[in-house]
């Protein structure tokens, strides 16, 4: 055997003898290896998609059919409620009517009659003093004959100016009854109705215990203007 070389090397590349490189195919004339790898990957991807679709069809990804809901049972209609009963309310205190009144007023035959008149041209009584016996039924006639065209009344109070002022204030708050004292006004013993100019009115009452008492007019401003008088009750 001779190791002598001839003028060229006997070593040949594997690729040249096989007709292609590793990335060109397995043998000469065959498809490139990269193409074969792409085809294999595509086939695998297709198989994966088919498997996923099969699982979805089998129920893995199929949307569940909604279950029918139970029909709600009809509820009973609410029982009719009765309207709340009206609570009794306390009636407001009745205002005094424009009429005679007072704690000493009586419905008896008078034993004595007395007349008082309004001054014709002033806010005053023509008679500024009276005298009557105690515990006597008296009818007082009041004549409002004046030239001023104003209203007047006659009110007997159980005391002096301090008591008269309180009675007068109560009457001022009773405009709906033309400023006569309201019923049960403390210390208002007797009064006539409020009279227009030219009218007359009367009140029957029992005289109080012996002493000195004021009588006034309770039309607004008249008592403060000095329209008052004194009743002296004798034993």
Curated annotation (Swiss-Prot):
Main location: membrane
GO molecular-function terms, A-Z: copper ion binding; electron transfer activity; oxidoreductase activity
Record's note on what induces expression: Present in both photosynthetically (anaerobically) and dark (aerobic respiration) grown cells (at protein level). A later paper showed this protein to be present in both chemoheterotrophically (dark) and photoheterotrophically (light) grown cells, but with more protein present in light grown cells. The second report is thought to be correct.
Annotated cofactor note: Binds 1 copper ion per subunit.
Skewed-composition ranges (Low complexity): 1-21, 87-100
Location within or outside the cell: Cell membrane
Entries under CDD domains matching the protein: Auracyanin
Entry keyword Metal-binding: yes
Biased amino acid composition, Pro residues: 69-86
One Gene Ontology term from the biological process aspect of the record: photosynthetic electron transport chain
GO cellular component terms attached to this protein's record: plasma membrane
Cofactor(s) of this protein: Cu cation
Keyword field: Cell membrane, Copper, Electron transport, Glycoprotein, Membrane, Metal-binding, Signal, Transport
Pfam family, one: Copper-bind
Described purpose of this protein according to its UniProt entry: Probably a soluble electron acceptor for the integral membrane protein electron transfer alternative complex III (ACIII).
Name of the molecule in the record: Auracyanin-B
């Amino acid at each position: 055997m001779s190791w002598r070389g001839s003028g060229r090397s006997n070593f040949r590349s594997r690729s040249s003898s096989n007709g292609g490189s590793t990335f060109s195919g397995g043998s000469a004339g065959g498809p490139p290896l990269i193409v074969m790898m792409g085809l294999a990957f595509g086939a695998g991807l297709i198989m994966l998609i088919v498997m996923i679709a099969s699982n979805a069809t089998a129920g893995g990804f199929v949307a569940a059919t909604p279950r029918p809901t139970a029909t709600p049972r009809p509820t009973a209609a609410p029982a009719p409620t009765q309207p709340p009963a009206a609570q009794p309310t306390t009636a407001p205190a009745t205002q005094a009517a424009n009429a005679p009144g007072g704690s000493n007023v009586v419905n008896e035959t008078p034993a004595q009659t007395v007349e008082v008149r309004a001054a014709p041209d002033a806010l005053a009584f023509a008679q500024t003093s009276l005298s009557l016996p105690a515990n006597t039924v008296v009818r007082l006639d009041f004549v409002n004959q004046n030239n001023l065209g104003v209203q007047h009344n006659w009110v007997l109070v159980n005391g002096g100016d301090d008591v008269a002022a309180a009675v007068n204030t109560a009457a001022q708050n009773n405009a709906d009854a033309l400023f006569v004292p309201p019923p049960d006004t403390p210390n208002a013993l007797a009064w006539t109705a409020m009279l227009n100019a030219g009218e007359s009115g009367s009140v029957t009452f029992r005289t109080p215990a012996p002493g000195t008492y004021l009588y006034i007019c309770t039309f607004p401003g008249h008592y403060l203007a000095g329209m008052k008088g004194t009743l002296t009750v004798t034993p």
